[in-house]
Structure formats: structure tokens, C-alpha cells
């Protein structure tokens, strides 16, 4: 087999003609195998050229993939799987990315936590769970989870106040239960004392709910019984 021509293409790759067949090769491949016009190559060398060029092709696709935003190792491996890259070659690409600074666990964790703080109301425990699912080590996560410490109470109060404004029918007792569940699902833990001390007068809500239930029951029962049944229903609602 013989290389008959090598021409630089507009996309930065080289069009290499070998025995009248054209191949798009990366500069890395050209330099690694010292390819030049009229060079003779055997089948083994040809196979290695194609194999390595496929490796570089996957590598540069991943470079483009990580240039859009920071990626986790899991995300990169999933992308490499879609490109049908073998495990050993995946490991080589991952190591190369780490060496060149494209893949940095601590940088990703810090950036992820800052985004969650600035763009969401998620709490530290949920953020920690999500990062663990992405394959990060707990000790690395804990280094930056402390970013929540000074703002935790402020964020909890913000969520509670938002829920208070939207509450039109819950008693204080049921409100505390519901919002407590919401806060726990959002990843907060130290919220109980804050919730217990909220300024919440549910008298108006009680009266509104009483009137709504009573007006339905009075159509079926005498006033005294309607009153008793109404209060029983309100009791089950935490009033």
C-alpha cells in the first residue's frame, strides 16, 4: 500500500489518498506515524492508523462536548458509549482530559453547588445526593457543601414565606407538616425550630373553612348537628 497524496482540508483534517482510497485523518495521526506522500505502508500499519484516527475522532468530539459546559466522568463515558468506544480507550480519553484540565471533579462540584445556590432553592442534602448519583466522592462534596452554611436559614425562611403567601386553607399544624415535608424533599434538615416559630395566625382561615363546610352541612342537618360535624371535620384538618 502506498500514500499517493496528502492535502489539508478546510475542516483542519488531512485528506490522505492510499491506493486511490481517500481517508480523513487528524494531524495527530499524521505526526504519530510520520505519514508523507509516496510512503509505503503495510496492512498492520494501516490498521493502526485507522484505529488511532478513530481514537482521535472520539477524543475531539468529547473536547467539543465538554467545551459547552462542565461534564462529569459519568456523562463523558455515556457519550463515549454512544460512539462505541472500547473501555480501554475510554480510560485513555478520561485520563487525557484530566491531565489537560477538562475533567476536574472539585471544579465541577464547586460550580454545581454555586449554581444550585444562585439558581434554585435546593438544600444541601439534595445537592449532595445528586452529586453522589453522578459518581462523585462524598469527601470531595463535603469540601464545598459548607457554602450553604451561612445562607441555610435565609433560604429556609424564603421558602416558608413563599408557602405562607400561597396558603389559603391549611391550619398552622397542617401547614407545618406540609412545608416540613417540602423542605425535607428539597434537602434541608435544620428547619423544625424555624417552622415552629413562624408568625402564623390561622383564625381567618379557620373561619373561612368553617363557613364553607357548615354551609354545605346545614342543608342536610339541623344547626347544632351541622356545627358539631363541621368542627369534627376541622379537627381532622389540624384546627
Q: Model-derived features: where do they sit?
A:
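An alpha-helical, amphipathic repeat domain used for nucleic-acid recognition
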Residues: 1-239
Amino acid at each position: 500500500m502506498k500514500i499517493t497524496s496528502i492535502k489539508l482540508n478546510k475542516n483542519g483534517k488531512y485528506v490522505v489518498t492510499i491506493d486511490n482510497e481517500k481517508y480523513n485523518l487528524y494531524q495527530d495521526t499524521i505526526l504519530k506515524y510520520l505519514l508523507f506522500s509516496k510512503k509505503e505502508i503495510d496492512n498492520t500499519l494501516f490498521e493502526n492508523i485507522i484505529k488511532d484516527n478513530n481514537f482521535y475522532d472520539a477524543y475531539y468530539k468529547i473536547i467539543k462536548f465538554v467545551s459547552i459546559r462542565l461534564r462529569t466522568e459519568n456523562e463523558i463515558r455515556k457519550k463515549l458509549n454512544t460512539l462505541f468506544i472500547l473501555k480501554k480507550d475510554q480510560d485513555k480519553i478520561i485520563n487525557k482530559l484530566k491531565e489537560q484540565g477538562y475533567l476536574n471533579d472539585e471544579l465541577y462540584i464547586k460550580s454545581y453547588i454555586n449554581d444550585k445556590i444562585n439558581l434554585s432553592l435546593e438544600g444541601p442534602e439534595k445537592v449532595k445526593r445528586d452529586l453522589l448519583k453522578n459518581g462523585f466522592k462524598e469527601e470531595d462534596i463535603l469540601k464545598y457543601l459548607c457554602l450553604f452554611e451561612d445562607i441555610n436559614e435565609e433560604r429556609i425562611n424564603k421558602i416558608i414565606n413563599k408557602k405562607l403567601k400561597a396558603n389559603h386553607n391549611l391550619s398552622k399544624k397542617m401547614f407545618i407538616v406540609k412545608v416540613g415535608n417540602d423542605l425535607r424533599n428539597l434537602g434541608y434538615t435544620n428547619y423544625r425550630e424555624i417552622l415552629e416559630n413562624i408568625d402564623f395566625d390561622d383564625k381567618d382561615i379557620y373561619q373561612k373553612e368553617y363557613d364553607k363546610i357548615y354551609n354545605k352541612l346545614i342543608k342536610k342537618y339541623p344547626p347544632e348537628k351541622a356545627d358539631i360535624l363541621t368542627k369534627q371535620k376541622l379537627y381532622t384538618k389540624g384546627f
